[in-house]
Amino acid sequence: MSAAIAALAASYGSGSGSESDSDSESSRCPLPAADSLMHLTKSPSSKPSLAVAVDSAPEVAVKEDLETGVHLDPAVKEVQYNPTYETMFAPEFGPENPFRTQQMAAPRNMLSGYAEPAHINDFMFEQQRRTFATYGYALDPSLDNHQVSAKYIGSVEEAEKNQGLTVFETGQKKTEKRKKFKENDASNIDGFLGPWAKYVDEKDVAKPSEEEQKELDEITAKRQKKGKQEEEKPGEEKTILHVKEMYDYQGRSYLHIPQDVGVNLRSTMPPEKCYLPKKQIHVWSGHTKGVSAVRLFPLSGHLLLSCSMDCKIKLWEVYGERRCLRTFIGHSKAVRDICFNTAGTQFLSAAYDRYLKLWDTETGQCISRFTNRKVPYCVKFNPDEDKQNLFVAGMSDKKIVQWDIRSGEIVQEYDRHLGAVNTIVFVDENRRFVSTSDDKSLRVWEWDIPVDFKYIAEPSMHSMPAVTLSPNGKWLACQSMDNQILIFGAQNRFRLNKKKIFKGHMVAGYACQVDFSPDMSYVISGDGNGKLNIWDWKTTKLYSRFKAHDKVCIGAVWHPHETSKVITCGWDGLIKLWD
């Protein structure tokens, strides 16, 4: 048996080699004896067969080809082995939903189906999209239009009619050429037309005759006259006195500064120490619409002037019974701004009816009216004693206009702003004034010189529709529309003080008035939510904030002789006194 196995091994080795190898092998290994191979001889009664079957290339179980038997998660992005096609596209593991439609049962990676990345020419896509939006047809995207003749989706009839034109193509317009008069014979000197010939259907436009021109002039004159009559007429001025007697037993009017209120109202010195107001002590109600602005009587502050969107101006007592003394009626639209002269005997009012009016504070008489047919947004008297006949007004047509009360004429115009002028404030002992505008700039002007010598406009700046000078005359507080109060120096360079920026209130869109306490320890301002905000001047910390009005708190004034009295006004039509 062992001899037979050896012989088989020898024959197995020789089967795969060349002839030379087999010759060398036979020379080295001796042939087995004939007796040992007797069992391999043919049997006469049976077919020849081998007792041992040998497979030269047996199947081997390779580790990489083994399937794990685990279903693939459709969300998996990476597989560590080579799965078969059946594994990759096997249905999702789990019970099938019998109520799913064919579209819902199909594999999806978004709500409406399966989206695959594809390269599309941006121009071609936009061309077909716009064509479909304009004409109602587009090329069928499911067909290869290079191989198949163009097929359209949408309005096929329109596509055939336009011969498949897209929005970026223009078809030839079937229009007849305009015919010209022909006379090309150059020898005809008078009648030769050549290329300058007129069109057959061309109409000559002639200048009107003298008679027609006269008629036209008469018609235009009538229209202009009619238009002038339709222009807004100034409202009739009248006044209402709300107290029984205008003068007291000594013959003094309400302009007389009282001396029995516990405070020296004639003093020029501010109080030594100011305190935070905490409670409401009085409400002045009389306006039927929102109050636009409040102004205290110059120096003493014993009277309060208010203007409102109900077209009225009212004068109130700050001390005593706090009555409404007089109402001034004369504007046909909302009053925007008011300003006392230095003595307080007269005041100006600016309204949306395009009129500026000068009133007598004591009698209520309207002394004069001014207009340049533009809306005045702010008005200011020149504070100098020798210039009480001059005032400036910021207009909606980007100009600052200077009027003389005595003549009623415009004597100067400052027209460098690029937007409507919002505020005017006198600085530097009234030799200069600062103006702000909707063009987001701040300009400084010398009095009576219509060229600004200082222009401040940073890219980060916003419009500043409310500006106030500090009591010591050194700083300008500007209400910026990005919800912060900016402080500029009011002497020499007018630089922004970056250490003094007051934040924490919401004023975007509202020209809320800013004011200082008399001792320069606090800064106050209303906001769009009807709250009164009080900051510390030194630290810029927000000390106090409380609800003052139901609507926008547009004005806030600290009484110049009181330690903690603040007057606020709002769009709820009320004026409130806080202490």
Curated annotation (Swiss-Prot):
* Phenotype for F502C: In PCH15; in knockdown cells, unable to rescue higher intron retention levels and to restore normal cell viability, contrary to wild-type; reduced protein levels in homozygous patient's fibroblasts compared to heterozygous or wild-type cells
Alphabetized CDD domains for the sequence: WD40
Query: Would the keyword Repeat turn up in this protein's UniProt record?
Result: yes
Disordered: region residues: 1-47, 204-237
- Keywords for this protein: Disease variant, Intellectual disability, mRNA processing, mRNA splicing, Nucleus, Phosphoprotein, Repeat, Spliceosome, WD repeat
Repeat region (WD), residues:
286-326, 330-369, 371-413, 416-455, 459-498, 504-545, 548-578
Could you tell me where this protein is found in the cell?
A: Nucleus; Nucleus speckle
Question: What's a GO biological-process term for it?
Answer: embryonic brain development
Ranges of Low complexity compositional bias?
1-19
**Gene3D superfamilies, alphabetically?**
YVTN repeat-like/Quinoprotein amine dehydrogenase
Q: Which InterPro entries match?
A: PRPF17, WD40/YVTN_repeat-like_dom_sf, WD40_repeat_CS, WD40_repeat_dom_sf, WD40_rpt
Per its record, what are the GO molecular function terms?
mRNA binding; RNA binding
**Disease per record:** Pontocerebellar hypoplasia 15: A form of pontocerebellar hypoplasia, a disorder characterized by structural defects of the pons and cerebellum, evident upon brain imaging. PCH15 is a severe autosomal recessive form characterized by progressive microcephaly, and poor or absent psychomotor development with severely impaired intellectual development apparent from birth. Other features may include spastic quadriplegia, early-onset seizures, and chronic anemia and thrombocytopenia.
User: Subunit structure, per the record?
Assistant: Component of the pre-catalytic and catalytic spliceosome complexes. Component of the postcatalytic spliceosome P complex. Interacts with PPIL1; this interaction leads to CDC40 isomerization.
Q: What does this protein do?
A: Required for pre-mRNA splicing as component of the activated spliceosome. Plays an important role in embryonic brain development; this function does not require proline isomerization.
Tell me what this protein is called: Pre-mRNA-processing factor 17
